[in-house]
């Protein structure tokens, strides 16, 4: 069997192989979280964050247009005003804002952790086809 055929078979096998997602590690922030740029969007009480560009249900002045350097993307938790930690406006009409359910990083942790994706790799012997 030619090298090209082996490579093609291996690529086809890998493409059809299922992927497994490893365990997720909770995101964390340093200091007061002003530099936090993760994608967490849930408050300490479990409420969903309102998008920074939205005025519903809460009108506010912290928009991405007015504060372009504060990372006010989507509805992600941020700290654009030097509060004690990352926060957001909530989608609950009765609760204007809350701190986010994030923890401060310990000294040996990074700012954002991403879940690992594991792709099983078959042995090369399984990819060979005997040709008579």
From Swiss-Prot:
Spell out the SUPFAM superfamilies in the cross-references.
Kringle-like
Q: Which residues form the Kringle domain?
A: 27-105
* Positions glycosylated per UniProt: 101
Q: In which tissues is it expressed?
A: Expressed in liver but not in other tissues tested.
Per the UniProt entry, the disulfide pairs are: 28-105, 49-88, 77-100
Q: Which UniProt keywords apply?
A: Disulfide bond, Glycoprotein, Kringle, Secreted, Signal
* Superkingdom field: Eukaryota
Could you tell me where this protein is found in the cell? Secreted
Gene3D superfamilies assigned: Plasminogen Kringle 4
Question: InterPro entries this protein is in?
Answer: Kringle, Kringle-like, Kringle_CS, Kringle_sf, Serine_protease_kringle
Cross-referenced SMART domains: KR
Q: Would you indicate the residue range of the signal peptide?
A: 1-21
Free-text note on domains in this protein's UniProt record: The signal sequence and the kringle domain are highly similar to the apolipoprotein(a) precursor protein. This protein is however much shorter and does not contain any peptidase region.
Descriptive protein name: Putative apolipoprotein(a)-like protein 2
Write down the species.
Homo sapiens (Human)
């Amino acid at each position: 069997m030619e090298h090209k055929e082996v490579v093609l078979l291996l690529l086809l096998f890998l493409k059809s192989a299922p992927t497994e997602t490893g365990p997720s590690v909770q995101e964390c922030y340093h200091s007061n979280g002003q530099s936090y740029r993760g994608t967490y969007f849930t408050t300490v009480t479990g409420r969903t964050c309102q998008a920074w560009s939205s005025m519903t249900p809460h009108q506010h002045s912290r928009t991405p247009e007015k504060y372009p350097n504060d990372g006010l993307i989507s509805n992600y938790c941020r700290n654009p005003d030097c509060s004690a930690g990352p926060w957001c406006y909530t989608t609950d009409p009765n609760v204007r804002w809350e701190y986010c359910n994030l923890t401060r990083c310990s000294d040996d942790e990074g700012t954002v952790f991403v879940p690992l994706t594991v792709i099983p790799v078959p042995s090369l012997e399984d990819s060979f086809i005997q040709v008579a």
